UniProtKB/Swiss-Prot annotation:
A cellular component term, taken from the record's GO annotations: chromosome
Alphabetized PANTHER family for the sequence: DNA TOPOISOMERASE (PTHR42785:SF1), DNA TOPOISOMERASE, TYPE IA, CORE (PTHR42785)
Cited function: Releases the supercoiling and torsional tension of DNA, which is introduced during the DNA replication and transcription, by transiently cleaving and rejoining one strand of the DNA duplex. Introduces a single-strand break via transesterification at a target site in duplex DNA. The scissile phosphodiester is attacked by the catalytic tyrosine of the enzyme, resulting in the formation of a DNA-(5'-phosphotyrosyl)-enzyme intermediate and the expulsion of a 3'-OH DNA strand. The free DNA strand then undergoes passage around the unbroken strand, thus removing DNA supercoils.
Gene this chain is encoded by: topA
Protein name, as recorded: DNA topoisomerase 1
Residue ranges of the region described as Disordered: 34-70
Length: 868
């Protein structure tokens, strides 16, 4: 009897599983996905010659439309008009992995597909079976919610079959996303700007951020005042009260005058306790984590982004420390409940254990077969993890505490409310005393300011002494900006996306440049605004929240075998294609990205400038750009944002920023400010380009973010000015013939000058007809094609390649010429850059992968480290 082959996605998971299976199993990793639809540039638009096909002279010529359709299908890898025929390709670099798996599978009696238990894991398992091939009856599917000895042995004792319905649900999602992305994005390039993209779920998520941005822009903060009074008791205790009512009505002065008038009356009033109420209250623990609540808690308590949270959770799961981290169910297994109840009783005592297990309801549609996210072994404390980085330990600590707390008794408080009268005014103070800590012994709560104040003894009718009155100005706050965590919460609430897709959605909308983050809050970029509008107009259902959520439910139906996946795709595509054809029409189709004409004269030709928006931001472009070539003017003016970013989202800084903005004279929306130069600021309506409103303000302006003197160009000696580009602020030379730039570092200083590019004619490019030049970048030295950006080939240099050019090198790189040129086996030393230490080192490589031999420059000497 031969051995059985077990295939999982990751080496870490393989290593953990291998501990629990006997020697009759061979556990191998596919290292993630092995097949996919064509990636950019991987699929040729040329059709292979077929046996018996007519020659080119005999074959009927394809119409331009049909030729374009075939090229699109070739790029997409899926044909929506011919039964959704798909062309999957082995991913680059995975050929050796597949060859090894085929070889091992050939000698195996059984092939166990032990990929993750969600739809994506099911799809990976199917792709593995399809790519490896052979008798399908040899393949078995095993799933487990946690990588423990018991769970693994149970899964392998009862293997199942691949669930093709779940595979088809994943394929349907992939095909939908591919069709929308590949067919709408070119339309955006044509109508709005190059380099834009659309996505079935991505664009809807951007719409949420854009709509919130518009709510904020339209919001007009209103002033109001609060008055607090510090009062003293007969026993000398001081208590802070808030003035809440005047003559029975809510007290809310609208300006300083009203607040000061109230202060005069309060100064002349006598203060007496009208009522004291003490009542018991309690606080129940919340449910164990699901994917979305884990992401929110990790953001709020640990400051983790969604992507980092899922990365750390993945490592914990693969090491066997937690259950599967992509779940929407709060369900806990009977074994898990028994384990944690025993732990609570042993660790904290009977009074912390409720009479029966706490049960939490999941949202409708949650997969109850899955469990909530919890520790695999509650007895394993966070400090006892082995081989985990600090951030993974912190996340485990959060998961462990939430799990234990969710099965503990409530925290009990004595809440106190005291009302005081002062003439026509009523004042109120609240506080509470913790009587029994309950679940908070494990999971301390984040209290609101003043919530846990302890009020001293005060009896009804007791007179209090006025110590101080404290008036404070406030402004009403606009809707809060989304953070990564709150956007995930909103997506979940609206039924958009699933636990396995939240992190990808959040990452994608940032990578596409439609939104940016400042102080961990999302801001919609102008291009995100424009694209959202155009997609809303041309693809109303695609951008509709209900439609997107409905599609998720339909995909759930496919996974349950209750709906045919190709019928679902056909229904979507029929309507989508009609809308796309209408949008593509030149006149009545999708609105183009029209510029706004201004009265600002072009510095080169005198024609009026226009406000334009590109994928890189807002700028001024000469109206003469559209003229015939001989008369054309290509002058542009970079616009530097002149607005402050709100310092935080919890306070009133957003309101104060809004109050400082100009309001559009046409539509009253808050305007965005940009610096034209040191004497002119341009205010552009937040609804531009739909609203043409703008204003020019004169004054003396200084660019925020730089407090030092102007710089002298290290190349030509001219002045360098601070500018803002797609990737942030930088210094650019004012000499039009000099293209020198230097980044602005976070500390407000200019980055060190870059080394001039060094031509290396002896080094020929590998993929294009060009030679290499040695360049100096943010990640140290690298080789790049001399005709960049036409040719984009780059690679790391060898030590032996830079030595002949030592005289041309910047002295700061001379030490690299003294590095070892080869490892002990004669492999050449490659110069690499460490993002962690921000320093260059050398290492030997085989097929682009480190051999284990490397050398570091430390203390003026090269030190070799050999881990081969």
């Amino acid at each position: 009897m031969g051995k059985s082959l077990v295939i999982v996605e990751s080496p870490a998971k393989a290593k953990t599983i291998n501990k629990y299976l006997g020697s009759q199993y061979v556990v191998k990793s596919s290292i993630g996905h092995i097949r996919d639809l064509p990636t950019s540039g991987s699929s040729s638009s040329k059709e292979p010659a077929a046996k018996g096909r007519k020659s080119a002279s005999e074959a009927p010529a394809l119409s331009p439309k049909e030729k374009a359709r075939r090229q699109l299908v070739s790029r997409m890898g899926v044909d929506p008009e011919h039964g959704w025929k798909a062309k999957y390709e082995i991913l680059p670099g995975k050929e050796k992995v597949i060859d090894e798996l085929r070889r091992l599978a050939k000698d195996a009696d059984t092939v166990y597909l032990a990929t993750d238990l969600d739809r994506e894991g099911e799809a990976i398992a199917w792709h593995l079976r399809e790519a490896i091939g052979g008798d399908e009856s040899r393949y078995k599917r095993v799933v487990f919610n946690e990588i423990t000895k018991k769970a693994i042995q149970e899964a392998f004792s009862q293997p199942g079959e691949l669930d093709i319905n779940r595979v088809n649900a994943q394929q349907a999602r992939r095909f939908l996303d591919r069709v929308v992305g590949y067919m709408v994005s070119p339309l955006l390039w044509q109508k709005i700007a190059r380099g834009l993209s659309a996505g079935r779920v991505q664009s809807v998520a951007v719409k949420l951020v854009v709509e919130r941005e518009r709510e904020i822009r339209a919001f007009v903060p209103e002033e109001y005042w609060e008055v607090h009074a510090d009062l003293g008791t007969a026993k000398g205790a001081n208590v802070r009260f808030e003035v809440t009512r005047e003559k029975g009505e809510a007290f809310k002065p609208l300006n300083e005058a009203q607040a000061m008038a109230a202060l005069e009356k309060l100064k002349a009033s006598a203060y007496s306790v009208a009522k004291r109420e003490d009542r018991p209250t309690s606080s129940r623990p919340s449910a164990p984590f699901i994917t979305s609540t884990l992401q929110q808690a990790a953001s709020n308590r640990l400051g983790f982004g969604v992507k980092k949270t899922m990365m750390m959770a993945q490592r914990l799961y693969e090491a066997g420390y937690i259950t599967y981290m992509r779940t929407d169910s709060t369900n806990l297994s009977a074994d898990a409940i028994g384990m944690v109840r025993g732990f609570i009783e042993d660790e904290f005592g009977q009074k912390y254990l409720p009479g029966k297990a706490n049960v939490y309801s999941s949202k409708e549609g949650a997969q109850e077969a899955h469990e909530a996210i919890r520790p695999s072994d509650v007895n394993l404390k966070p400090t006892q993890l082995s081989g985990m980085e600090r951030d993974a330990e912190r996340l485990y600590d959060l998961i462990w505490r939430q799990f234990v707390a969710c099965q503990m008794t409530p925290a009990e408080y004595l809440s106190t409310s005291v009302s005081v009268t002062a003439g026509d005014f009523e004042l109120r103070a609240k506080g509470r005393i913790l009587k029994f800590d309950g679940y908070t012994r494990v999971l301390p709560q984040q209290s609101k300011p003043g919530e846990d104040d302890v009020l001293p003894e005060m009896k009804e009718g007791e007179n209090l002494k006025l110590i101080k009155l404290d008036p404070s100005q406030h402004f009403t706050k606009p809707p809060a900006r989304y953070s990564e965590a709150s956007l995930v919460k909103e997506l979940e609430k609206r039924g958009i996306g699933r636990p396995s897709t939240y992190a990808a959605i959040i990452s994608t909308i940032q990578e596409r440049g439609y939104v940016t983050t400042h102080n961990r809050r999302f801001y919609a970029e102008k291009m995100g605004d424009i694209v959202t509008d155009r997609l809303n107009e041309s693809f109303a259902n695609l951008m509709d929240y209900g439609f997107t959520a409905g599609m998720e439910e339909h995909l759930d139906d496919v996974a349950q075998g209750e709906r045919d996946w190709k019928h679902l795709l056909d229904e979507f595509y029929g309507d989508f294609k009609k809308k796309l054809e209408v949008a593509e029409v030149s006149e009545k189709g999708m609105r183009a990205n029209q510029p706004t004409l201004t009265n600002i004269p072009c510095r080169e030709c005198g024609r009026p400038m226009m406000i334009r928006t590109a994928s890189t931001g807002v700028f001024l472009g000469c109206s003469g750009y559209s003229l015939p070539p001989k008369e054309r003017c290509k002058a542009t003016v970079n616009l530097i944002p002149g607005d402050e970013i709100a310092a935080d989202d919890e306070g009133e800084s957003e309101s104060r920023v809004l109050r400082g903005k100009h309001r559009c004279p046409i539509c009253s929306t808050a305007m965005d400010a940009y610096l034209l130069d040191e004497k002119h600021k341009l205010h552009i309506c937040g609804n531009n380009p739909d609203c043409p409103g703008y204003e020019i303000e004169e004054g003396q302006y200084r660019i925020k973010g730089y407090e030092g003197p102007s710089l002298e160009c290290d190349k030509c000696g001219s002045e360098m000015q601070l500018k803002t580009g797609r990737f942030g602020k930088f210094f650019g030379c004012t000499n039009p013939t000099c293209k020198n730039t230097r980044k602005l570092l976070k500390n407000g200083e200019a980055a060190p000058p870059k080394m001039d590019a060094i031509r290396m004619p002896e080094l020929k490019c590998e993929k294009v007809d060009d030679i290499y030049v040695l360049r100096d970048g943010a990640s140290g030295m690298f080789l790049a094609a001399s005709q960049f950006p036409k040719n984009r080939e780059t690679r790391a240099p060898l030590v032996s390649e830079i030595i002949p050019h030592k005289a041309e090198l910047d002295p700061k790189y001379h030490y690299l010429c003294d590095a070892p040129q080869k490892d002990p086996d004669g492999r050449p030393a490659v110069i690499r850059f460490s993002r962690k230490t921000k320093e260059q080192y050398v290492q030997s490589e085989v097929d682009g992968k480190p051999t284990g031999w490397r050398a570091f420059y430390d203390g003026g000497k090269w030190k070799v480290e050999d881990k081969r």
